[in-house]
Amino acid sequence: MATTMTVVLITSVLLVLAEIFPRDTDGQAAHKSTDQLSQLVDHLKLRKLSRRQYCPSNTCNERDECPGNCNDCEYVPGTGPNKRCVKK
């Protein structure tokens, strides 16, 4: 029981401190929305975009073996005799 109360107390103190102290002190975030939901949505959009742009360097013989976000299957210097999926 005592450990549960301690955890609750520490959590509540940390939540209060997180609201008191500013997150950005450089002034860059002055024009950003402070709504946490919109920040989460923005973060998820950035992750989705970066995932779309990622092309894994899988071993391949033809372009058809590569994922849709890769443009070609070609020899890449330093990867040995195998072809790799690449994004140009």
From Swiss-Prot:
Listed GO CC annotations: extracellular region
Tissue: Expressed by the venom duct.
Keyword Secreted among record annotations: yes
Top-level lineage group: Eukaryota
Propeptide: 19-50
Keyword Acyltransferase: no
Disulfide-bond pairs as recorded: C55-C70, C60-C73, C66-C85
Keywords, comma-separated and alphabetical: Cleavage on pair of basic residues, Disulfide bond, Ion channel impairing toxin, Neurotoxin, Secreted, Signal, Toxin
Post-translational modification comment from the UniProt entry: Contains 3 disulfide bonds.
Leader sequence segment: 1-18
GO molecular-function term, one example from the UniProt record: ion channel regulator activity
Compartments, as annotated in UniProt: Secreted
Domain statement: The cysteine framework is IX (C-C-C-C-C-C).
Family the UniProt entry places it in: Belongs to the conopeptide P-like superfamily.
Entry function: Acts as a neurotoxin by inhibiting an ion channel.
Protein's name according to its UniProt entry: Turripeptide Lol142
